[in-house]
Amino acid sequence: MHLFSLAFCVVRYPVDTFRALQASRDRFRYYPAVLLLLLLLAVRMVYLFFLHFPLAGTGAVEINVTMEILKLLIPLAAWSVSVFAVTSIMDGETQFREAVMATMYATVPYILMAIPLTLLSHLFGSTDAALFQILLTATEIWIGFLILVSVMVMNNFSLKKTVLVLILSILFMALICAVGLLMFALASQLYQFIAGVIREAKYALFGT
């Protein structure tokens, strides 16, 4: 459980945590990342279903669980691929599995804050939405800070180079998502075309 315990150390000692993560490369295991992912999905569902309605804007019955899971998994996967690709081009030292692990550790602030924010939302009304949004934004900034630290420390980059890598990674991630959406649209059109051909063939052969 050593690597899993690093997830909690990342809150207080992010630099040391990411150094320890890379130093334990020979003892690498994926299960801490899987556990963190499951925790992330769990707290996200709690947040979505139990957030106070005036702040949530949507009711629980309107939530598409599958879509919400995909909205977490796809960006995490795309970011891991993007940041690894860019750091590799920029002479980074991180392996892909370490990029995945660092990405998951960077989500720890959300794992820690989602449920407290959900509980706190029941003390807030719609007039307190700005304050709630500030707390949520602070959590997102915290995640961004951990991502920056992980890239800088684990690849031995300067701050300037790290910022450049992050910008390029975001652009590459956007490209991946755009290509993915294009492929999905093409696959959908192809499916509809094939289904139409089959329907026409059935009608021509059987009249139904």
Give the predicted meaning of each segment.
Residues 44-72, 117-140, 177-208:
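Membrane-helix interface segments in multi-pass membrane proteins
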Residues 2-97:
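Selected alpha-helical membrane-embedding segments in polytopic membrane proteins
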Residues 27-28, 34, 38-41, 101-106, ...:
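Solvent-exposed, non-transmembrane amphipathic alpha-helical segments
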